[in-house]
Amino acid sequence: MKVKTKLLGIISILVVSIIGIGGSSVFMISSTVKKNEELKDKMEFQKEIKHIQYELTGLSNDERGFLITRDKEYDEGMKGKADDVLKSLDRVNDLIDEEKYQSNIEDIKTSFTQYRALNQQVVTAYSSNPKKAETIHFGEERTIRKEGVAPAVNKLSDRLDQEVEDLKDEIQGNGKMSQSLIIIVTGISVILGIVLSIMLLKSIMVPLRSINKQLEEIAHGEADLTKKVIVKNKDEFGQLAQSFNSFTHSLTQIVKQISSSSEQVAASSEELSASAEESKSTSEHISRAMQMAADSNVKQSSMTEKSAESITELLDSISSVASNTGNIADLSSSMRDKAEIGSKSVNKMLDQMKFIDKSVDSAGNGLQTLVASTAEISDISSLITTISEQTNLLALNAAIEAARAGEQGKGFAVVAEEVRKLADETNKSANHIQSVVATIQNESIETVNNIKVVQENVSSGIVLSQETTGNFNEILNLVEQVTSQIQEVAAATQQLTSGVEVIQHTVHTLAAGTKETSANTEAVANSSQEQLHSMGEISYAAESLSQLAEELQTVINRFKY
């Protein structure tokens, strides 16, 4: 598998995981906000029903007060409370559009209309016939209130209480489930990203280190050309290892050929030096050994030509080495380009991580809105508590008035006690609502903290991506070092080429001198001094050739082949 394919696979997996986290978070938060809006509406509905209960109780108390004291203020109070009940029923219709509540609302309206009509009859009849007014109040009107209005309101109130509790339980359960889901998905994504990144780095660094070690040994160390780079990967590094092994094999053949040629050059130079000394020592007897000198010159010329041919072959081999070195440099540049592509892909993954970080911030803002809504619910429950306390105070006042009325106020005292109990129950319910709201606020704050944990995990993912980018930069630096070392090998090869060219030039010069000596053999007797001088030059050239051959052999001995 190619390195590029591995990188794209890892990035795709991480991006899919991140999108999954963001999508699930947005879905969960949207669902929670929707449920809270529904809870808010129902609690507002509940508040209006409680208000209707309170006004109905006040209306009944005002009617009893009117019958006892004949105070017109009670009549005005009854009218105001009746209007408040009708307004509350209208607000309830605006708040709730569900058909399941319509029948309850209609029952309350019908019963209250009947109750209000009887209430007005009591007020009208009291001025002319107080006894009739009391009969209506404690008879038919009381029956409608006890069997019609109050049960209808209480039934709807109990139903709303149960639905509010169920909705709160559902919101709490959804919050816990979303928290667990986000933590699990985030943990799996982080672990998967770390494992895949380690696997990718291992598949890159192991073959790269092996190749780099071999190149260092060739450039600065043992120069062992028998070693092979073993890379089982089928990616760019596997291809690079195969190319490198082919290069070392070709280089081994070239070094062997150069070694053989240098040995021949050394042997030829030694023979040439020996011949020159022999010619010099026998220059005084040149006339008697003319034929021997001619034979030696012929042999010397043949050996010089062979040396020239060997050196030419050596020069061609070194040129091939230089060409192969250039190819390796091109491969190193290609490897550097691949690493740069990998670095850009990791940077793209880093941008995706930052996008998810912004999405989690948006989710946190949604939860902050939820906390604000629960605070508003808490204010509403506080208002209910205040109303219940006022009702309790009114009940106390009614009990005092009943005590003052004596025997006639006993029934009114019983009603006042019932009102007080109802106010206490309302106060307890309001306190319970405040407790539940506080629980929701605490859970919301905990969810906000969990989102902060998610943000920290995303930040860790960003840091990990930045570290991966640093590792790619380190790979690029290593590739640059490999390229530099290959360039040093190319420079050394160029120096070797220059040395061989000097040897070639010297051998050609020697060949030319040998031919000239052979051509002038017949005139040696007349120019023995010139021949001695020529033999000195030949001896010097042979020594130079021998020295160059030794230097070439020293360079070759650096390689193990």
Swiss-Prot record:
Main location: membrane
A Gene Ontology cellular-component term: plasma membrane
Superkingdom of origin organism: Bacteria
Amino acid composition bias (Basic and acidic residues), ranges on this chain: 277-287
UniProt-listed InterPro entries: CHASE3, Chemotax_Me-accpt_rcpt, HAMP_dom, MCPsignal_dom
Presence of the UniProt keyword Acyltransferase in the record: no
Bilayer-spanning residue ranges: 7-27, 181-201
Family of the protein in this entry: Belongs to the methyl-accepting chemotaxis (MCP) protein family.
Protein name (record): Putative methyl-accepting chemotaxis protein YoaH
